[in-house]
């Protein structure tokens, strides 16, 4: 039927439009192209076996476009509004609708799925059960996705390349989430973001290589910044914000780390700063303060503390200067071979500071059995750095003042 034109229909090639009964505005060019189109309108096919050239069932659908050898090869029935461009693009699609598949082998395993968009060689090439996905990039989303992966978005070379199950997954960037097989609600944006994770869920990674070493079933981590959280490989529930910011260890849990080059202190700790181990928080209001829950209804075994003046007398207030990061022992995590500000923060180098020495505080604590394990003035971080929390001293100061006040009253009464 070469060079035939009926009601705006053009068919060129061996058996092209071979079974057309009625229809309008279709253009078919190629060996066996559209050979089983019977009644559909507005179909366009260019290429060997394109648009149903390999099946015996009639094609009655409309508004399909198939360009390339075997593009839409098996399409049939009432399939409509599919755009298939590239060799073997959508070649197994039979009755699916509203799919856009562009690129060699793009969406080649889809059968009767709908509303998928795949652009790139091998994009969405291994899935036969998924709907409503957006896959853009060579080899992106090429795994055997199931219906549990409906709505997946992958943009970038090999992004989401291994996904089989994973509702609510979004991967944008070269290699983002490329190893994930199953896991819900992961979001990775950036070059190789979350690229090694396999089964975790509810993670958010934004930035080049963010959470790039998570390689198991990590859950509910948030990392924002280039290389943020890159040292995590088995941790959960961490929030890490800042370029090169990291948790204290690969299996950290519940850490909050904010700041460029900052490393977390310990699990359940919040660490803020700029590449120093000494953290500070500036508040704009002079009346602002930090509050912690202290409700009686949350406590039991309440007793009057006996730790007071005797402990205070063991402490030695000191003045000191902060070193620069390049001057501390190289074994410490704070060491940096560069001209960085003092460890106390920008503007503190050379200034006389006031405080305590952590090792001396620990020695004083060890001498007082009435200081219980919940006393948090002294801490040792996972990297061995010792730290002091001055705020924990307040109850002891109050007790010391009460003891002194009682002595004064006793003296005055004599």
What kind of feature is each model-predicted range?
Residues 1-294:
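Glycine- and small/polar-enriched repetitive beta-structure motifs of secreted/surface proteins
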Residues 293-414:
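Intramolecular chaperone/auto-protease modules of tailspike-like proteins
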């Amino acid at each position: 039927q070469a060079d035939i034109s009926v009601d705006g229909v053009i068919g060129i090639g061996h058996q092209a439009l071979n079974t057309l009964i009625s229809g309008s505005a279709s253009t078919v060019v190629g060996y066996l192209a559209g050979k089983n189109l019977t009644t559909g309108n507005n179909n366009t096919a260019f290429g060997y076996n394109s648009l149903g050239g390999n099946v015996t069932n009639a094609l009655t659908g409309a508004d399909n476009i198939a360009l390339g050898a075997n593009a839409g090869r098996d399409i049939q029935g009432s399939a409509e509004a599919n755009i298939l461009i590239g060799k073997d693009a959508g070649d197994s699609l039979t009755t699916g609708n509203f799919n856009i598949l562009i690129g060699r082998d793009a969406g080649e395993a889809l059968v009767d799925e709908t509303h998928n968009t795949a652009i790139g060689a091998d994009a969405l090439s291994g899935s036969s059960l998924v709907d409503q996905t957006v896959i853009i990039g060579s080899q992106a989303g090429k795994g055997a996705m199931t219906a549990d992966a409906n709505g997946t978005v992958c943009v970038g070379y090999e992004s989401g390349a291994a996904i089989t199950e994973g509702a609510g997954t979004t991967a944008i960037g070269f290699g983002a989430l490329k190893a994930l097989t199953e896991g819900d609600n992961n979001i990775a944006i950036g070059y190789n973001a979350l690229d090694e994770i396999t089964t975790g869920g509810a993670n958010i990674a934004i930035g080049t290589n963010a959470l790039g070493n998570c390689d198991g079933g990590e859950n509910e981590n948030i990392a924002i910044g280039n290389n943020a959280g890159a040292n995590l490989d088995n941790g959960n529930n961490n929030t890490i914000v800042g370029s090169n910011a990291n948790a204290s260890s690969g299996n950290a849990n519940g850490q909050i780390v904010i700041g460029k080059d900052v490393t977390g202190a310990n699990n359940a700790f919040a660490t803020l700063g700029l590449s120093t181990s000494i953290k500070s928080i500036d508040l704009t209001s002079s009346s602002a303060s930090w509050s912690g829950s202290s409700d009686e209804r949350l406590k039991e075994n309440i007793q009057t503390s006996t730790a007071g003046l005797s402990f205070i007398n063991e402490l030695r207030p000191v003045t000191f200067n902060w070193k620069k990061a390049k001057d501390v022992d190289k074994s410490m995590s704070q060491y940096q071979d560069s001209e960085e500000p003092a460890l106390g923060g920008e503007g503190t180098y050379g200034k006389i500071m006031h405080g305590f020495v952590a090792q001396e505080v620990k020695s004083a604590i060890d001498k007082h059995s009435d200081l219980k394990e919940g006393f948090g003035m002294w801490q040792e971080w996972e990297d061995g750095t010792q730290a002091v929390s001055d705020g924990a001293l307040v109850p002891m100061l109050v007790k010391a003042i009460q003891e002194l006040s009682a002595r004064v009253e006793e003296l005055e009464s004599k």
